């Protein structure tokens, strides 16, 4: 996760884990790293106990927040500041996430892709890609194998926000799936959070 803050801001968010199947119960380490590379917070979240986390930003910029739920489901929410999910150059993994994810298409962009796939045998998702005006660009259900929405804009982007809606698939198992933004900044923002651009 990235979260943007000005020097002196008090940044807060909630963290929690939920058990998945027979994976072992485990605490979740959370680390916040400043733009300079300095670690400003290290905290451990007890298993299945929602925890409020906060820190004072020592400098202005984007802070990297890392959390590892192991094989279990984890969630960071209720952000006080603009944030985005990032795979730091890799795909972002979701588990049974239903909702909208917003992303920014920068000024001048003409071509980008949204690549998705399920994990393992038969795990998938239903996905709908929406234009900035809310019009549906494309939709696919029971997305198990790799699929890519390929977007070629008629005119270069003026800087716009697109959305990806994910929901339970019609016939595939509803568990793990991945999202990989191609040709644009790999930053996804869940609905309800302020967009980091």
Specify the residue positions occupied by each region the protein language model found:
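Acidic, Ser/Thr/Pro
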Residues: 1-197
